[in-house]
Amino acid sequence: MARKKSSGLKITLIVLLAIVTIIAIALVAILPTKTPAVELVSTIPGKCPSAENDRLDEKINCIPDQFPTQALCAMQGCCWNPRNESPTPWCSFANNHGYEFEKISNPNINFEPNLKKNSPPTLFGDNITNLLLTTQSQTANRFRFKITDPNNQRYEVPHQFVNKDFSGPPASNPLYDVKITENPFSIKVIRKSNNKILFDTSIGPLVYSNQYLQISTKLPSKYIYGLGEHVHKRFRHDLYWKTWPIFTRDQLPGDNNNNLYGHQTFFMSIEDTSGKSFGVFLMNSNAMEVFIQPTPIVTYRVIGGILDFYIFLGDTPGQVVQQYQELTGRPAMPSYWSLGFQLSRWNYGSLDAVKEVVKRNRDARIPFDAQVTDIDYMEDKKDFTYNNKTFYGLPEFVKDLHDHGQKYIIILDPAISITSLANGNHYKTYERGNEQKVWVYQSDGTTPLIGEVWPGLTVYPDFTNPKCLDWWTNECSIFHEEIKYDGLWIDMNEVSSFVHGSTKGCSDNKLNYPPFIPDILDKLMYAKTICMDAIQHWGKQYDVHSLYGYSMAIATEKAIEKVFPNKRSFILTRSTFAGTGKHATHWLGDNTPSWEHMEWSITPMLEFGLFGMPFIGADICGFVVDTTEELCRRWMQIGAFYPYFRDHNAGGYMPQDPAYFGQDSLLVNTSRHYLDIWYTLLPYLYNLLYKAYVYGETVARPFLYEFYEDTNSWIEDLQFLWGSALLITPVLRQGADRMSAYIPDATWYDYETGGKRTWRKQRVEMYLPGDKIGLHVRGGYIIPTQQPAVNTTASRKNPLGLIIALDNNAAKGDFFWDDGESKDSIEKGKYILYTFSVLNNELDIICTHSSYQEGTTLAFETIKILGLANTVTQVQVAENNQQTIIHNSFTYHASNQSLIIDNLKLNLGKNFTVQWNQVSLDSEKIDCFPDNNPENKQNCEERGCLWEPNSAAEGPRCYFPKQYNPYLVKSTQYSSMGITVDLELNTATARIKMPSNPISVLRLEVKYHKNDMLQFKIYDPQNKRYEVPIPMDIPTTPTSTYENRLYDVNIKGNPFGIQIRRRSTGRIFWDSCLPWGLLLMNQFIQISTRLPSEYVYGFGGVGHRQFKQDLNWHKWGMFNRDQPSGYKISSYGFQPYIYMALGDGGNAHGVFLLNSNAMDVTFQPNPALTYRTIGGILDFYMFLGPNPEVATKQYHEVIGRPVKPPYWALGFHLCRYGYENTSEIRQLYEDMVSAQIPYDVQYTDIDYMERQLDFTIGKGFQDLPEFVDKIRDEGMKYIIILDPAISGNETQDYLAFQRGIEKDVFVKWPNTQDICWAKVWPDLPNITIDDSLTEDEAVNASRAHVAFPDFLKTSTAEWWATEIEDFYNTYMKFDGLWIDMNEPSSFVHGSVDNKCRNEILNYPPYMPALTKRNEGLHFRTMCMETQQTLSNGSSVLHYDVHNLYGWSQAKPTYDALQKTTGKRGIVISRSTYPSAGRWAGHWLGDNYANWDKIGKSIIGMMEFSLFGISFTGADICGFFNNSDYELCARWMQVGAFYPYSRNHNITDTRRQDPVSWNETFASMSTDILNIRYNLLPYFYTQMHDIHANGGTVIRPLLHEFFSETGTWDIYKQFLWGPAFMVTPVVEPYSESVTGYVPDGRWLDYHTGQDIGLRKRLHTLDAPLYKINLHVCGGHILPCQEPAQNTYFSRQNYMKLIVAADDNQTAQGYLFWDDGESIDTYEKGQYLLVQFNLNKATLTSTILKNGYINTREMRLGFINVWGKGNTVVQEVNITYKGNKESVKFSQEANKQILNIDLTANNIVLDEPIEISWT
């Protein structure tokens, strides 16, 4: 039944409907005049489409205002096709609706045919039967058509700039043609060049009635931008059946389609990747809605006026926008000061509150230019008044702003109160307006319309009335006489009313209730505004409503012209219309503090750029509701790149000006940072705004304007550009420190580092921590800059600069400068204009216009050039083509390839040329002849390298040619967890002949183990090579995620290289893209990398002169040898770990090469580093930090965190090599006790043994076991020495050797059962040593053959444990073991006959730079070909594992010690390798009693802290040579703060123990060791922390103060943890010491007083018996009263040193266990307490309570230092719920409070609270 009716309807429609015309430009219709013709096409009247031809996505809704029914659809003469769950219209137009075109003869693009209405029913009544179509070819790029009623004048927008009566001749050669279809009428606009239809109304009918106009157009592209004002969320329009109402409304933005403040009917569309684009503008101010559907089709539904369309064609999107602005008016040129940061708030409440905001932001050095006040400054919110009570003194405040170079902006609302002033006086503003009849009137035209806004009952100025303009101008002028404001903010001008329509309501008529109401908010025309039948000079409110803000902006501009003659000033408006930007700027209204609103601010910023309002921004941090610190911080970052930059929020919510968050808060710091960048870039922004004013260019720019050839750029709207050259990537997600960012197809440089990014035309994950925003400069552009200041008044006086970002060695830019405020400076030519260009290392600075004389005092003083691949050694400058002059003030940074030229004086108004060279320096050359063979030209050239004898003495004379690289990339495979790259030998490099033949095929594996750690290894995939058999603690499966990684890895193909970049800064920290950056041979491996910084630390086992590495061509060999440490001498340890601190905020990373073969590393100054090793593979681990201490912790996590020593081991240790008997030791012990010198541990060296045989006791020491038992009973501990070498020449049973033979534990010759015999300390039995023999003769005559245990074997560990346990149980007790000579050391070379059996292993083709380099690797150790056995049973050459010998001995020794004693114990090892610190401490070897060794010991301690061996120290007073009194005294002072504090020296030198000098020395020793013992709980807590978490105890200053570059070179001071600084004297005859005082509060340990120094070097008083010690404010140190040893001190009262910081806060921790049990932390058998000071309250919090010996945890004393000047009257403690008063004393003048708790019985395992008043 339904189907039958539908069929009948279709037949009826065929008969009744008439078909209208379609317009399009025909390419073939060209008249001889080159003016395109209009092609007319006749069509046959149609009907509803058949089912097969029914395009659902092309249906145009016939019933847009209500839910359709079939009956209603039939009544409208439309087509019914309901579809469930479909957004397509159920009722759509048939193709016989619309108008019929009246034919004309000889049409062209400028013509005026008539249109006649077809017969179908009207939609909303009052159809207009006859219409007039007017078309105009206005320019080659702009086509206009309008449709009007020829019989009745309809409302047309009285725009102040657009000429509605265009009368010019048709454009010749336009880019478009037009095609018209006659019936039904339609029009098409076609691009000539490609026949693409841009605008096609044939998709739907023209509807034209008195109060309803509809037209649809089909578009060629789905990429549409514009229309407003709404929250579109995305810049590219969502085409999925969206309705956007346009009608100005006081409505805050939200997640909806509400119509907002502005009326903007322009949109733009990009057509294809050629950039061709078009725009459409409807000049109509009536309420409307624009409906967009997916085809895409755009339908306009307008309720008044006319249809007046402008179509713009451009070759690029930017051209289209320029053409639109050419029509509607280009934006105003803002005053320079208005570009500065503005602070504002609604409802400060009082002037005092405003003053406080200004003060705190000035104090925080927040640059800002203008203070804004909202309506709360007014009296009762009345315009042109101010509140004499709450804002008393406002004129004086404004003067203060002006005196500080700042401006004052006031708000003015349009609504004028009709009530008197508060004092009863007349409100003159209202009275004068009444007299001049300037108000909006009711429909009678005579009665002012009364509404209600902020002041209460109000009238509304009619700004379209010329009289009103005069009145408004006069009021602004009068008020300026009273308050010297500088700019005006006009608000509420949509126009807004708090009552609907008026206080009387609105009449029931078709203006207030039209037949069709667009989808506006509330669906009521006069909701929150005035009645639509109200009368204005330009017409009825129905027509002109959306022009209210526009007309007010024009009126305000006129007022400004009077108030500030010839000045630009500043006008900010909320409501806008097309062309408003010519008169005012705009902000995005009353937003919400939410992450969504911050994100959504980017799209309208870009949209208003289209609309001709580029000076645009949002309320930073949000307007309504409380913001959050994180949101506000991120918003300040993005806001710094809004063209208009204002922080504004509503009353009743928290303040959100930057300084409110704290003077040193992260928000303030990042805000200041980016404000400084903002002010630095203001010349660039001003230049962009100049080009917007002159040419109509955009400022904040979407990617598609610049990169239209890349379709990815068409949808990007979470990033934006400033002009062409600056890319901004904000963080828009809560809690995020990474943003998925698209990097357009260009060269990009990190703005802050200058480093070149490798990204291009790709999506990347950009790491942006809490204080960072992504900011990148585009290659090929030059950006003008100026040194920032606190405001533009100051900054405009500062020197100018240029940032030149090169692309293919070229760049361009321009610069505009005027006085920043004159109204017509451009029109009058009073400005300076420059163009810049760079080509081939030459910058031309060309002044094209100079008529601003005052500006010529400014000069370009700094030029920064990014992207210079080679070093610059010369810069020349020339003025006005004169002779060039050498300019010497410049710096080239190789790490980021940038050049900074400073101290220039290139004054404005002149032309200049700046030239620079690019050369390859000696410092960049890679040594081609590192081996020990004679280096000369012949040998060099035979190798295939380049010879340059005139190179610097330090640099290589023989070096690799740049164009060669041994390996090429064959294939690359990427995965989410890493990269695998296969490399093949580059045959083109065959002429380079290195020590052996390269391996032809290599494989690189990169593994992204963690977000802050990665590994890459390079090996031979075809032949198994030796790899270090040490397990690393790394995830079985990588745990990193792409989004969260701190690094990016880039594989370069030619030359092959690995680049690793820190995401947060863009800095490349590993870059092996160097000539011969990789070479891998069987016995020679080389890899080179550029370094990002000259601040490099680490590489152990070699003596360094300072902590920071010297990069001036220094080579450091690493190979374990029994060799006392000395400069460049390879010594006991092998530690291939370094970290680098970068010059960008203290970022640091660590690099660890897991390789145990002999190697050397070479630093060179460019800076770069080359590793050369003679075996194994390359296996690198990188740790990203980001600061030095964190990078170190990450390294320790991989190799194993440091061992936790027993508490007693932190006491003082005494030892000597050369004790003759037990009596000598006993006497020493008694003397130490008698002198009350604290000490815990006594040693004996090998002299306690029989003939230096392990596990024996010599004749003079038979009573040693009893002595040891005695002192252990008195709280002491004993440590014995064990050497690895086991004698094999014994005539009596020697069980250690015999059981070793049985267990097969000794190192052998390869493929035999023969032991490789050596000689060390053990003597032959029954031999008398002849003292007249030389050392070598004595070794041959008296030393026994010894065998070295192979500690890599499992059986050896078992044998070793048996020997240790047997000696402990059978002979004597001990508490710790000292393992020495374990490099391993031998007194013969290789074997007892000084011969080895494999030449190439002991004398490899490349011999690293080792001590005795020519003597072979076997010098004073085993032969390299000897064979050892791994735990898995496989054999390995000593050649590969030599450096693991001491490491392999450490764990078996530690395990045996703990098994034997049942206690934690301590092992001290001389030889080390990475991870040895898990089981052993280390001393720095056999040093000399020289002054320089004291300083070297600090370097060694700090280095071994990096290496994960924190329990370390040097032999106090020196091992070799006689010490002297002053040297030993100073060494005792610094040694008291070694983690491992031991006095030790060699036989046949004078005694140097503390009691061996005199009583004064002994007393000094007591005093300094008492300080140590007092601090042991703090020290022990630090040792626990690194055991649990990794890190350092002995800490370089830069680890705590990494952002302070002054700490980066310090190596004669150190920290204990974060809080305790030691500044010793390390020079002879000195009674003062110069130390660095980092930025913080420091309190003298000896006096408790603030030293009042920060961030500077200072000379401190240091007489002989004083060492300078300081505590860092903000920390709490747990202490304990000292005693003779730790057994007794642990029973004394605890105390706290509370060192307050500047804010009277501090924090600290105490870890406490029994001090000796095994794995107390792992078993939870400990106490962990956190202490906090907050002002005058000290609290403790129990974090873990697993230790029960309360006797050791009694809190007796608290010393509060730096407490403030307030005199304390009372101290109370709350403990176990009880509050008590406590005893105290104070030194008020020193800010010291001493609290005595001994009477209160306080135990730390319960929380406490202590407060004082």
Swiss-Prot record:
Major location category of this protein: membrane
Record: glycosylation sites:
127, 388, 669, 791, 896, 911, 1221, 1289, 1326, 1340, 1432, 1521, 1545, 1558, 1703, 1772
Keyword list (alphabetical) reads: Cell membrane, Disulfide bond, Glycoprotein, Glycosidase, Hydrolase, Membrane, Multifunctional enzyme, Phosphoprotein, Repeat, Signal-anchor, Sulfation, Transmembrane, Transmembrane helix
Q: Which residues lie on this side of the membrane: Cytoplasmic?
A: 1-12
- According to the UniProt entry, which residues carry Phosphoserine? 7
Q: Catalytic activity, per the record?
A: Hydrolysis of sucrose and maltose by an alpha-D-glucosidase-type action; Hydrolysis of (1->6)-alpha-D-glucosidic linkages in some oligosaccharides produced from starch and glycogen by alpha-amylase, and in isomaltose
Reading the lineage from the top rank, the first entry is Eukaryota
Record topology, Lumenal segments: 33-1813
Which GO biological process annotations does it have?
Answer: carbohydrate metabolic process
Q: Where is this region: Sucrase?
A: 992-1813
Q: Which GO terms describe its cellular component?
A: apical plasma membrane
The kind of enzyme this is, by top-level EC class, is hydrolase
Subcellular location(s) of the protein: Apical cell membrane
Disulphide bonds in the chain:
48-79, 62-78, 73-91, 506-531, 621-632
The post-translation modification note in this UniProt entry reads: The precursor is proteolytically cleaved when exposed to pancreatic proteases in the intestinal lumen. Sulfated.
Further remark: There is a high degree of homology between the isomaltase and sucrase portions (41% of amino acid identity) indicating that this protein is evolved by partial gene duplication.
The UniProt family comment states: Belongs to the glycosyl hydrolase 31 family.
Function, in words: Plays an important role in the final stage of carbohydrate digestion. Isomaltase activity is specific for both alpha-1,4- and alpha-1,6-oligosaccharides.
* Protein name from the UniProt record: Sucrase-isomaltase, intestinal
Question: What is the originating organism of this protein?
Answer: Suncus murinus (Asian house shrew)
